[in-house]
Amino acid sequence: MNIENYLSETLAKVFQKLGYAESFAKVVTSTREDVRHFQCNGAMPLAKFAKKPPLAIAEEIVEHIDAEDIFAKLEVAKPGFINITLAPKFLADTTNRFLNSNKFGVQNNLPNRKVVLDFGGPNVAKPMHVGHIRSALLGDALQRIHRFCGDTVVSDVHLGDWGTQMGMLIEEIKLQSPQLVYFDENYTGEYPTESPVTVQELAEIYPRASKRCKSDINEMEKARLATFELQQGRRGYVALWQHFVRISIDAVKKDFDSLDVHFDLWLGESDANKFIDEMISYFQANNFIYEDEGAWVIDTNKDGVPPLIVIKKDGGVMYGTTDLATLWQRSKDLDPDEIIYVVDKRQSLHFKQVFSVAERTKVVSEKCKLKHVAFGTVNGKDGRPFKTREGGVMHLADLISQAKEYAKNRMPDENDDSIINQIAMATIKFGDLINNYANDYFFDLEKFAQHEGKTGPYLLYTVVRAKSILRKIFGDNYDIKSLAKDYKVVNAHNEYEEKLQLQLIQFPIAVQRAYENSQPHHICEYAYSLANSFNKFYVNCPINNLDDESLKKARIALCMATVKAMTIASDLIGISIPERM
């Protein structure tokens, strides 16, 4: 139950009864919880339509509200705010209801939808680096959130395995090892099962090949020709390319596994290649495609968005072509209700073109919504894209090692590697996901690793503190679900209990915002606020030495609720919680 929605529906009945549009009855969480819990600001915009002062409208609304079981206090403040304070029993009962529900008050979306999530997107032959973490962590959080809310999710890594970089690699290897059988056009036998290069060598070859092609137009033409021949099915090139893909996927899977990020599909641009001819024929049959200066293009029919080049002058296909073919493939194979691309904002124009063409040509069905989650860049303290001290790109494995080093330095007596890894992952993931995805942000590992403030280790520390209370009372193998039947939250005895209850019942609000806006930072902010409320409760509301048994059990119930809410919230952003720290 989203408490904002519940209160809005309660007020909407009064608005309707008085002849006002229900849309003005929206209730939001107050930014001043010391003054009120929630507020309704609808009287101000409503005044223009009702031809009444907003203060008079607000007073009229409050006069007609009859819900003493929900509200302890309803006050009107200038120029027309309705300030809401919840009744203590309603607050306690709602907290209990959430504690005893599987998803802490979150209800499944109805009807359930099928959502394809395209994220990760590493390129073959390139090791993953710090710049890849945004797509990986944001996409993983979104798949967790969508599944939690009841959607059927299909996640696809969508490897970059079919572009000009493949031709660059082929030509570079041909230059250094021309004797390899892959380059003999007359060869008809079986190709070796082992790759002629390792993934480490591939990572060294690509920058060299890229540099050569950028500095020499003739070398670039060779790479383009090799790419074209690969896409046309030249046997030796296909066999060599298959080696590139296999060894790259093996390495990338290890990187994603280290982040606890997993995919349902490991497809790439190449997997859509077999659909391109069918799709082009469809475009031609329906007069969507036309020739322009030797290339074949499709108009987007959107102001300011240029046509999409589908086939180049040389007959090769473009990045946009394979993206369209991927949409074609996903529509036929999966029939999704939504496809979400988690790709950085520098690709915004590209996706506007692809989405516009896909919708105009009906590559996707009318029911299918296309969304680009366009995230900002990961920058260092200097405001530029994050680099190592030596000025190079930091590989993901090195970043994780650094995070573990920070965790170990702050806990020198901790010898459990699994706990160090959990702290390191919380450091990296929370440090990234606490930011609104649309913004660039500064990646400061030293700051993210602090055990105080808005950090992952602070959240872990808080939950471990709450768990230790329960462990001291119930032993190591306690089960919150079964215990919650006998431990009930009661009306708050002080402001710390009240604020903790109020924070707990806002969990469904945070989840809904994260779900609807593809913004996991709402869950991060919720978890941080809940951690603050619990730590104040912990300091000011003793449990172990209480003589009042009913109050003791009520506070234990609040500890249970905190552990449950924090555990679910942490899991939604891909963070696992240790038993101790």
UniProtKB/Swiss-Prot annotation:
A Pfam family reported for this protein in Swiss-Prot or TrEMBL: tRNA-synt_1d
Subcellular compartments: Cytoplasm
Major enzyme class: ligase
GO biological process, alphabetically ordered: arginyl-tRNA aminoacylation
Reactions listed under catalytic activity: tRNA(Arg) + L-arginine + ATP = L-arginyl-tRNA(Arg) + AMP + diphosphate
Record keywords, A-Z: Aminoacyl-tRNA synthetase, ATP-binding, Cytoplasm, Ligase, Nucleotide-binding, Protein biosynthesis
The keyword NAD is annotated on this UniProt entry: no
Enzyme Commission designation: 6.1.1.19
UniProt motif 'HIGH' region: location: 122-132
Single GO MF annotation: ATP binding
Family note: Belongs to the class-I aminoacyl-tRNA synthetase family.
Subunit and partners: Monomer.
Name under which the protein is recorded: Arginine--tRNA ligase
Organism name: Francisella tularensis subsp. tularensis (strain SCHU S4 / Schu 4)
